[in-house]
Design a protein with these regions (language model features):
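Structural beta-strand segments of beta-rich domains
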Residues: 159, 167-171
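Histidine-centered active-site loop/cap adjacent to the catalytic His
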Residues: 123-150
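Short, solvent-exposed loop/edge segments of extracellular or virion-exposed proteins
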Residues: 152-162
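Extended acidic/polar, glycine-enriched regions
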Residues: 172-251
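Conserved SGNH/GDSL esterase-like catalytic core that processes O-acyl groups on lipids
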Residues: 1-49, 91, 234-237, 242-251, ...
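Extended, solvent-exposed functional surface patches
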Residues: 234-299
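Substrate-gating cap/lid alpha-helix
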Residues: 74-111
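Structural recognition of the beta-strand scaffold that forms the well-ordered cores
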Residues: 24-30, 66-71, 107-110, 127, ...
Length: 299
């Protein structure tokens, strides 16, 4: 991006072709090469000016064009210069890109989020492979069309789930851009609108333990999701090493193994699947909330 940096985009033939094409949609994803020590330390003060000038050149070529500015894709920790300045310069640029989008009146597209926890999709620590490119393509498609696949909630939401008592309850998910999302639970009704990135959140008032079960309903004009037998209670997160992998069914103590389980206890078992990086969600269809009994407590 930097006009005095390493291989400036404005000096490439691709830039001249883009101007001559004068497209209606302009998607800009530049800046990674500007983390080069030949660029950022010397010319970083020009970054905002050069970026705004680039946007203006496309608007001059086509005054009716719409512009999307992209937060940069990740740089993995395996990059040879990651700890020698590149990491810090990368985050400086990301902050400036967000400000540039605001100043220019352009729409911001986040290309970092989808690959941030997937270094396995960046073979050279910088460029995505085919699967990573597919994630970027879907992100850009959603930003341009507003189509994020309709109403969706994380897999942790299911029938029989337990919501933490006496705490405000954030309910979050994805819907198509601009869709109105309505959430109802225990006499409460909250509404919001999905943002340009498809994300939405509403916060419900705290629930007290009452012994009652509820239906959580989340809806848009095109889809409705109902989660039944939802209760308020204490939610405990159990994780760790081999001690948490030990199953009750494998205990030698038959008395403990065969002890009746109170039916008020509910379990959400995240079945382990090997991954190269931490995941924000899981896709195992067997991970759902269940009421504990002899058939599942030993698993």
């Amino acid at each position: 991006l930097l006009n005095k940096g390493y291989r400036p985009y404005t000096q490439q033939e691709a830039y001249q072709k883009a101007l001559r094409f004068a497209g209606d949609y302009v998607i800009i994803h530049l800046g990674l090469n500007d983390t080069d020590p030949r660029a950022w330390p010397n010319y970083r003060d020009d970054f905002v000016r050069d970026y705004l000038s680039l946007i203006e050149s496309f608007r001059k070529a086509n005054p009716r064009c719409k512009v999307w500015v992209c937060r940069m894709t990740p740089i993995s920790h395996r990059h040879p210069r990651f700890k020698s300045g590149t990491r810090d310069w990368y985050w400086m640029e990301q902050a400036l890109i967000e400000e540039i989008a605001r100043i220019a009146g352009a729409t911001l597209v986040d290309l970092q989020e989808g690959l941030y926890d997937r270094p396995d999709l960046l073979p050279d620590a910088l460029h995505p492979n085919a699967e990573g490119a597919g994630i970027l393509a879907r992100t850009v498609y959603g930003a341009l069309t507003g189509d994020y696949g309709g109403l969706q909630l994380p897999a942790i939401y299911s029938d029989r789930m337990v919501l933490q008592r006496d705490q405000p309850l954030p309910i979050s998910g994805i819907a198509n851009q601009g869709e109105k999302v309505t959430v109802t639970l225990a006499g409460q009704r909250k509404e919001t609108v999905a943002g340009t990135n498809g994300k939405w959140t509403v916060t419900l008032d705290p629930l007290r333990v009452s012994g009652k079960s509820y239906t959580l309903t989340v809806s848009t004009p095109s889809r409705t999701l109902n989660y039944r037998d939802v209760v308020a209670g204490e939610v405990w997160l159990c994780s760790g090493q081999s001690n948490m992998l030990m199953q009750v069914g494998g205990l030698k103590d038959k008395t403990l193994r065969n002890t009746p389980v109170p039916d008020q206890i509910r379990l959400f078992h995240v079945w382990t699947e090997p991954t190269a990086a931490p995941q924000e969600d899981f896709k195992n269809a067997y991970s759902v909330w269940v009421k504990t009994d002899a058939s599942n407590i030993g698993q």
